[in-house]
Amino acid sequence: MTQSSTARSLPDAPQPAPEKGAWPKPSLLIADCEFIKPTRSARELCILETLAQDGSLSQQKLGQSSFLSGAMVNQYLRTLQQKGLVRFVPADNKSYTYEPTEAGEDLRRSRYAAYSSELVRLYSALKGCIREKVASLETKGIRKIALFGASETGEVVLSALADTQFDVLAVVDNDPEKQGKMFKGHVICSPEALHYLPIQAVVITSFGHQDAIYAQIAPLAAGKGLEVMKL
């Protein structure tokens, strides 16, 4: 690209109206995190990953995937261009589309591999923490348990318990829309099922509503002599 073309301002390229539900796309990053905050490298990866899928996206759409303002996306794009990782392709005399260069694609692949490796390590560490947490039940001779909460956390707990001595007899949830559906090999039941199941403990797998769920099942737990564990 010539010097004159790179000196132009970088307004958003005009875009056709997206299909309903097309945006926002799933992002590699997690918004509003206290402990796992995106680094500059992670944001660059997110932008490169998004551009690899569609280089005609506006800066607004790029900002949605990387949780950046339009002005910040503009700065990131300029930096990536200066590093030879992204090229600006004129769409008309006012706007651009953005394409990863060969070097940019190489960087995207290597960073994606490193990013995925970190996530796998984090996932493994989380499963280890869960196994350590529920080990106190095992020392009490408890084997037959139910999980309360058919959520993503519940999926992690089921995975963590897969190679243990625990026998998960049921997964229950308060949401009527979930009840009756399959969840990782279990049919999601109403909490009423806890009255009839031959369980020894209930593990609450909802981080967001642990106290409310604990209060909900406390009378049943007292009546049946069940252990109730919050994660």
Each predicted region: which residue ranges?
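Short alpha-helical segments that sit at the start of domains
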Residues: W23-C46
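Hydrophobic, well-ordered beta-alpha structural blocks that scaffold small-molecule cofactor pockets
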Residues: A52, Q60, S65-L85, A91-L231
